[in-house]
Amino acid sequence: MPGDLNLKKSWHPGLMKNQKKLWEQEQEALGEHLKIKAKSEELKKEKEKQELIKLQYGDANNVPIKVKRELNNLNWMYDDSKSGNKSNSEFNDMDDEFLLGKRKVENMLSGNKYIDTKETSRFEEAISSSNNGDKNIQNDPLIRIKNEQLKKYQSVKDSGRHSSKDRHRSRDRSPNRHTFRHKSDNDKVSKHRHSSHRESRSGRSKSKSSHRHSRDKDSIDGSKDYSHLSQRDNTKTPSEFITY
């Protein structure tokens, strides 16, 4: 007997890939259910807290501002104290001073430098941090390198412009340029003269050839007339010669 042929079907639930898909869907549904349950418990606790505050203060207008902020989870926006992050900020300041070269390792280890632990507001802290950020940007070595590269590029560009201007001036002032111009002008004049002389010579030759042609034509016509007359004279009789 062969095995179950339905196992070869893609829709069969006995296949491992279908079982894996089913398990993943069940896990997603379970996670969503847990999130909803946790949120409902949180809302339930907030409602109980609000009821206790109402019982304690009575009217909502009598509730102090700090308690209202705690209920709305807005107390972190108005908390000016930095008791929790005091030690971390001190260590961060020391690290920044060491990286910027303002403090040596010996002083850090000995602890001779006095650290001001005065509490300040967040507004003052933000202003001081922005000023320190500007100073750090100005003292950044990468930015310095970039500025030096820009200066070098600008200097090379300016030097190229000056060199091109000097070249043009030297070309204008060079005597060879003027001599070349005079030579070119003289060549043009000589070419024009040669062309005019050639044209005049060609005109003369044409007139001579036409004169020769007319002379040849006249000579041919005269010879024809003379031959005709000779023929007429030959046809005369001796008596006509005598009378003539």
Curated annotation (Swiss-Prot):
Basic residues composition bias: residue spans: 164-181, 203-214
Polar residues biased stretches: 127-139
Subcellular location: Nucleus
Keyword Nucleus tagged: yes
Ranges in a coiled coil: 27-57
Protein's UniProt keywords contain Nucleus: yes
Entry GO terms, CC: U2-type spliceosomal complex
Chief place where the protein resides: nucleus
A Pfam entry, by short name: CWC25
A Gene Ontology biological process term: mRNA splicing, via spliceosome
Highest taxon listed in the record's lineage: Eukaryota
Annotated keywords: Coiled coil, mRNA processing, mRNA splicing, Nucleus, Spliceosome
InterPro entries, per database record: CIR_N_dom, CWC25, CWC25_splicing_factor
Region (Disordered): 125-244
UniProt feature, compositional bias: Basic and acidic residues: 215-235
Subunit structure: Associated with the spliceosome.
Function: Involved in pre-mRNA splicing.
Annotated family: Belongs to the CWC25 family.
Protein name: Pre-mRNA-splicing factor CWC25
